[in-house]
């Protein structure tokens, strides 16, 4: 069964908008776990626009599920990860001017530096995932540098029109198959919603979906615990089969 990692960055976004103490991402993470979250995902950005170092440390101490730290491949973040020892890190591209992560890592063009990070993390028993687009070039490069995991970027699928969504779904489905053939374990995320998650959750060998914005948006209406329960049920028992021909 596909697991659910709940990204709580948007809780911190609300807090930082007023530079206040609430809402507290740590408290919300615990509610997410009560709702059935299999893991908590956070992105500690270099500019600290939402998640803060304090959040990271408290989450490591308090949550009962897995902590997945999304981070840029920088010296500062590597040192933080080695000190904190999260259950997993996910290396993502990062630009200060972006609102959210806009695309996957170019592993093929940065193989040497990324391999050094992956090797270092794995030697310290920190599993490392690479956030990549679902294409053979990046998947093959990820395998070559020794990564155990990849997280497939589902943004193009999520943004696609109704007409084009089956095509984008096929790319994700084929990406999962290619990754597994290369010996990689596969997660996915970015832009998934209550309306589009079920086909992705139906893909065989998809291990975890990392989802944040749509759950937090839903939580405003019905509460975080119930929002997570609803998403968990969709992933656990998807009613829709994969698109025809995929």
UniProtKB/Swiss-Prot annotation:
One Gene Ontology term from the biological process aspect of the record: pyridoxine biosynthetic process
A GO-annotated cellular component: cytosol
EC number(s) recorded for this UniProt protein: 2.6.99.2
Residues binding 1-deoxy-D-xylulose 5-phosphate, per UniProt: 9-10, 45, 50, 100
Pfam families, per database record: PdxJ
Annotated positions binding 3-amino-2-oxopropyl phosphate: 7, 18, 191, 212-213
Keyword 4Fe-4S listed: no
Catalytic residues of the enzyme: 43, 70, 190
Record family assignment: Belongs to the PNP synthase family.
HAMAP family: PdxJ
Record's protein name: Pyridoxine 5'-phosphate synthase
